[in-house]
């Protein structure tokens, strides 16, 4: 009985594999680059992390507003700065006045409250908190302008030649 089941499963597997092979051959798929990817985003880029080879791009050089992807750079600069100064993410910081009431998505920070850098990072990345971005910029950079300069410098170091940040949260800015 077990032998019969094994033969049946093997036969089905072979038939499926052959069917896929015929389908691929019939439709002319010879390699992964010939497959059209349906991406609804305006821009896209897929890169091999090991080699740096660009595997797919869609309007990669077209100017676009960074929106909340800005928050990724805010998190990166924050994490690298904390590591550089050997500061624990659990370190408590005081929320600056300018972080209270920032428009858009928020973690509802109150000026003067104490919160850990780690919690600000969670609020930044999980809730997309614009107020958390402003608080981190003020705390890490001394002010938002200097922090944005740090972000742009880091982007340049990473090879982002056409990238320009105007604020730490990605809210609309003509720049």
Q: Where are the regions a protein language model picked out?
A:
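Hydrophobic alpha-helical membrane-insertion segments, chiefly the h-region
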Residues: 14-25
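Active-site-adjacent loops and short helices of periplasmic peptidoglycan-processing enzymes
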Residues: 26-175
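N-terminal Sec-pathway targeting helices
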Residues: 1-13
């Amino acid at each position: 009985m077990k032998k019969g089941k094994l033969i049946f499963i093997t036969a089905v597997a072979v038939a499926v594999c052959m069917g896929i092979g015929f389908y691929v051959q019939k439709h002319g798929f010879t390699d992964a680059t010939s497959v059209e990817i349906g991406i609804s985003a305006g821009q896209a880029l897929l890169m091999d992390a090991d080699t740096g080879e660009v595997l797919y791009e869609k309007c990669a050089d077209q100017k676009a507003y960074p929106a909340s992807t800005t928050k990724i750079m805010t998190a990166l600069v924050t994490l690298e700065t904390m590591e550089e100064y050997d500061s624990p993410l659990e370190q408590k910081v005081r929320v600056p006045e300018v972080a209270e009431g920032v428009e858009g998505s928020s973690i509802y920070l109150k000026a003067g409250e104490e919160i850990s850098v780690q919690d600000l990072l969670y609020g930044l990345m999980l809730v997309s908190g614009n107020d958390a971005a402003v608080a981190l910029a003020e705390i890490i950079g001394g002010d938002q302008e200097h922090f944005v300069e740090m972000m742009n410098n880091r982007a340049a170091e990473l090879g982002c030649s056409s990238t320009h940040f105007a604020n730490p949260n990605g809210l609309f800015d003509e720049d």
